[in-house]
Amino acid sequence: LVAHPGAHVKTGEEAGIKRIAHGLDEIHRRCSDFKVMILLEITAGQGSTLGYKFDHMGQIFKQTKHADKLGICFDTCHAFAAGYPLFPKVDYDATWQEFDTLIGINKLKAFHLNDSKKGLGSRVDRHEHIGKGALGIEPFRLILNDPRFANLPMVLETPKEEGDNHDMDGVNLTTLRDLLQSN
């Protein structure tokens, strides 16, 4: 189950993180028989939304009693809009090092793949077709060919246009497949 963590709604980030951790504990208490992992999605940081800093997620994991039942869904547009560069390679590596330090790479369980209509650090959540936005192609090439992520599910989350004469999901998937390097 993938969910955005929530917002602090004028109570401040620390109070919001505490409330989210408590809410997750309550869900796990009430649904202790369920075997579903909750994946918190990295957010762009619009308004008072939490989860746009890797540290937010790390703090939620530290404060909840059930961190073993939580993981992360990494949304490429959201992370970029939140200020995490995914290219060039040196910045990509630095972003993943920070992710590992603050959250733990083992907590990464899925990706939402999409480009961004807005720039790095804009904190605006506007998805774009792969290679057609501010991210471009290179971050997707790096992610798709990173052996750490080879077995993780990756969900295409690009815009759906009404009345489009061609299948943009097919176009986006072809673009992504073309980036895979054979070993």
Model regions and ranges:
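Active-site acidic/histidine proton-transfer and metal-coordination neighborhood
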Residues: 1-71, 168
